[in-house]
Each structure stands twice: as C-alpha cells, then as structure tokens.
Amino acid sequence: MNKKQIVLAVALAAALAVTGVLSGCGSKTAKNEGTVTLTNVSYDPTRELYQEYNSVFQKHYKEQTGKDIQIIQSHGGSGGQARSVIEGNKADVVTLALAHDITLVEKAGLIKKDWLQMFPKDSSPYTSTIVFLVRKGNPKQIKDWDDLIKPGVNVITPDPKSSGGACWNFLGAWAYGQKRFNNDEEKTKDFVASLYKNVSVMDSGARGATTTFVENGQGDVLIAWENEAINSVRQQPDAFEIVTPSISILAQPSVAVVSKNVKKNGTADAAKEYLSYLYSDEAQRIERTSRVIDKEAAGSMERRKREGYF
C-alpha cells in the first residue's frame, strides 16, 4: 500500500466515526533576538523521541547558524492535533501519525499542496507498526487478532475520532480480516465490529490508552504502536510483554512545514532544517524504537520480525 492509498484508506476509516474537535494552544515568540523559536505539533507517543531529538538538533542548529533555537512541543491524539492547527495553533511544523491528518491541514490552506514531496520517503522519516501489549505471562493467551474477539477479553485501544494510532489499529484489524475471509468485506466488517465490542476504554490518544493499560491496570491487551509497546516493556520488563500478530500494517507517520505560519513567524528556514535533520544519521539513531529508514541505523535498532506488510 503506497502513501496515497493509505491516505484514502484512513480517510475511509475516519469516515466511520464522528469527527472529534479538540482545541489547541498557541505559541510563542522568542523575546531574545538571537533565539529562534519553533513549535512542533506532534502525536501522542513521540514525547520521548522529540525530547531527545530536540536536544541534538539545538546543538546542530547552533553549529550551523550561530543561533540558539527553542522548540516548543505539543502532543496529543493526531486528529485532534491537526484540528488544533486548523483552529489557530501557530505550529511551525507538524509531525503527525497520519498523512490524512496533514492533508486536513493542507486543505485548510495552511500547508503547501506538494508537502509530500518536500522531504524524502513521502515526508515520512520513520515508520512503525501495530503490536499487542499484554501482561506478563500472557494470561489470556492472546496470539493474534482472532483472540481479541473472544468473550471475556478486555481490549484497550484509542478512539479513531481523535487518534491516528487508533486508525492504524483499525487498519491492522481490517487487513487481518481481509486475509482471513478472502477479501469478503461483509465478514471483515463483522469481525472488526466484534473486536470493538470488546473494547472497554477508548482514550483520545495513544499515550492515554497506554496509561489506562499500564498505569491504571485496565484491560487484558493494548493495541499499540510498536515503539510505545517497546518503551512500556523497557520500563517494566517484569510486568508486560509484546505479542506480534501474524499480520500488521506498516504505519507511516508524516511531517510537514506549516507554510502559512512560518511565513508569518519568519521561521521557514529553521522549520525546513528541523524536519530535514530527522533524516540525518544522528537523528536516525535516536529514532531507534521506530523503524528508521537509514539502513545503517536500522542495523542497531530493536527490530521485530513481521509478516503480512502491505
């Protein structure tokens, strides 16, 4: 499935739900004349990634320009974040879970129509996939998507109305249903509907869903971004483990410069460099819990084998 197909597929999935609207917060300007300020509006599970990346980029930017740069981060469900920009959040860049969400901002006249071509790999500097996070020992013996529709299995996943990760979760389940039922759409719909009947909590974003499962102890299985699941296991290796479904989906988060805002803010060059540097060797090593696009960096990354990408 190429990027354009994914955009259409996610748009179709999103159309099944009532669109949620979340308001956002505005930004800045730097009081210090020698300091550039950027606002990066991003999706939920990228907090740690951009905390580390921003530190590296600040050093790089200082070396290249002689100027200091301050980066303001905003995180939340990808759909809600896109709408916050449309409604007035003065983001310089967006780094969102779905190309579809950036397309919404583009259609609002804030991003150039050729944004997909502005950066390599269709403006997708890293990828991920969807896995299951279960409690240690896997007490419900969850091994594949089929197990999520069994009676008594309590599933946690975010809300597709506001979360990009939730849309990828939906598409992963749909892909499994299509293969299992030989592309029978009605049977696939019934399968996915049965899965969502077992969902007890739908938070607005992926990080909220992780908190519900990991910290609040709710649910038997969390459908999660791979990098989010890896972080949970790293932090509590005796409490959780990852289950790899037989079929998943290659999730491609996207990035773009908010051209209308950077023109007003005078930050166009800094914003472009901020996103371009995500493709550097140094940044690709930081993105180690995502599926980086640099082959050398990927060699040292904690990667898990997958089947059934499309």
Model-predicted segments: where are they?
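Short beta-strand->loop
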Residues: V41-Y43, V134-K136, N154-F181, Y196-V199, ...
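N-terminal segment of the mature folded domain
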Residues: K31-S162, E302-K305
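Periplasmic-binding protein-like
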Residues: S124-T129, V192-Y196, D203, Q235-K263, ...
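Short, low-complexity disordered leader/linker segments with a strong preference
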Residues: M1-T37
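Ligand-binding pocket segment of bilobal, Venus flytrap-like solute-binding proteins
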Residues: F181-S246
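Sec-exported extracytoplasmic/periplasmic mature domains
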Residues: N54-E63, I86-K90, A99, E106-L110, ...
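Extracellular/periplasmic juxtamembrane helices and adjacent flexible linkers that interface
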Residues: V262-F310
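Short helix-loop capping/hinge motifs at secondary-structure junctions, enriched
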Residues: G137-K143, S162, A175-N183, N261-D269
